[in-house]
UniProtKB/Swiss-Prot annotation:
It comes from Staphylococcus epidermidis (strain ATCC 12228 / FDA PCI 1200). It catalyses: tRNA(Trp) + L-tryptophan + ATP = L-tryptophyl-tRNA(Trp) + AMP + diphosphate + H(+). Keywords: Aminoacyl-tRNA synthetase, ATP-binding, Cytoplasm, Ligase, Nucleotide-binding, Protein biosynthesis. One of its GO terms (cellular component) is cytosol. It holds the Pfam family tRNA-synt_1b. A motif ('KMSKS' region) lies at residues 193-197. GO terms for biological process: tryptophanyl-tRNA aminoacylation. It is an enzyme of class 6 (ligase). This is Tryptophan--tRNA ligase. PROSITE patterns: AA_TRNA_LIGASE_I. The lineage of its organism: Bacteria, Bacillati, Bacillota, Bacilli, Bacillales. Catalyzes the attachment of tryptophan to tRNA(Trp). ATP binds at Q9, P10, S11, G17, N18, G145, D146, D147, V184, K193, M194, S195, K196, S197. The gene is trpS. Its EC number is 6.1.1.2. Homodimer.
Length: 329
């Protein structure tokens, strides 16, 4: 069975866009792959974090994974910082990465420009750690969005470089992009991706938003003036985005939804979608609360840590042996 790895930062509550584009799809692949789902808290601290808030968000994200439908009997759910192999392998890959290729990363350049108080070295060395997250589990498949595509290209380059120098030690992962319609955009500016870090609360719906508040956000979402409910990303980005959300939460095809609302106005469509979103959040948040407040969550994370430590150990030792680290045993 092939291995799939995915990591999410505990830097805020995921949105319904994260749910439709990633979390929901993870549930569907649990029977087909050996899955490792990682809460990448060491990536989160590449920018300043409040200690207590970060701890809370780690637990929240774990409960969100489980509320989504991640099954700990099928998949490994764990916290990055509890598996030392990540940073150990990350350092090894950092030594074969060049400053130039790290500085060319678009995310580094974007975040560095916003830091008037100096650029943390962790922002620069983020990609080798991300590569290590992936390779220590002999990962075959990595589902990523467009924003991580460049990092994945670097990961594959680092694997090629390591294998060229030290013989074929690492598995070269393949990238899996989101399904068509899986990319959810901002509600007020549908030309940009929905983001949990957006300053405008009306642009996104958090998985922990009050359901009635989320419904209002749908009703006030940007559309257009022609009143035709049709999927057309280029010419009708607003209504196309709402169709993606409708389809993602109901599993109805966009074509069926278009047919259902043929001749109907945006008011009727938005009203129905707002109820769908509200009902989804009520149900989701009930599951979330049951996991967040349960001791079972810690047991699940403890077991995930043990499985991840065991799975990563073999690859880490191969890397160390290849580079001549430690003692010969």
């Amino acid at each position: 069975m092939e291995t799939l790895f995915s990591g999410i930062q505990p830097s805020g509550i995921p949105t319904i866009g994260n749910y439709i584009g990633a979390l929901k799809q993870f549930v569907d692949v649990q029977d087909d792959y050996e899955c490792f789902f990682c809460i990448v808290d060491q990536h989160a601290i590449t920018v300043p974090q409040d200690r207590l808030k970060l701890r809370k968000q780690i637990r929240q994200l774990a409960a969100i994974y489980l509320a989504t439908g991640i099954d700990p009997d099928k998949s490994t759910l764990f916290i990055q910082s509890e598996v030392p192999a990540h940073v150990q392998a990350g350092w090894m890959l950092t030594t074969i990465a060049s400053i130039g290729e790290l500085e060319r990363m678009t995310q580094f350049k974007d975040k560095a420009q916003k830091r008037a108080d100096g650029v943390p070295a962790g922002l620069l060395t983020y990609p080798p750690l991300m590569a290590a997250d992936i390779v220590i589990y002999n990962t075959n498949i990595v589902p990523v969005g467009d924003d991580q595509k460049q990092h994945m290209e670097l990961t594959r380059n680092l694997v090629d470089r390591f294998n060229s120098r030290y013989n074929d030690v690492l598995v070269k992962p393949e990238v899996r992009m989101p399904k068509v319609g899986g990319r959810v955009m901002s509600l007020q500016d549908p030309t940009k991706k929905m983001s949990k870090s957006d300053d405008n609360q009306k642009n996104f719906i958090s998985l922990l938003d009050e359901p009635h508040v989320a419904a209002k956000k749908i009703k006030s979402a940007v559309t257009d003036s022609d009143g035709i409910i049709k999927f057309d990303r280029e010419n009708k980005p607003g209504i196309s985005n709402l169709l993606s959300i409708y389809s993602g939460l109901t599993n109805e095809s966009i074509k069926n939804i278009e047919s259902k609302y043929e001749g109907e106005g945006y008011g009727k469509f938005k009203g129905d979608l707002s109820e769908i979103v509200k009902d989804f959040l009520i149900n989701f948040q009930e599951k979330y609360a049951s996991f967040y407040n349960s001791d079972d969550l810690d047991d699940i994370l403890d077991k995930g840590k043990e499985k991840a430590q065991k799975a990563s150990f073999k690859t880490l030792k191969k890397m160390e042996k290849a580079m001549g680290l430690g003692r010969k045993r």
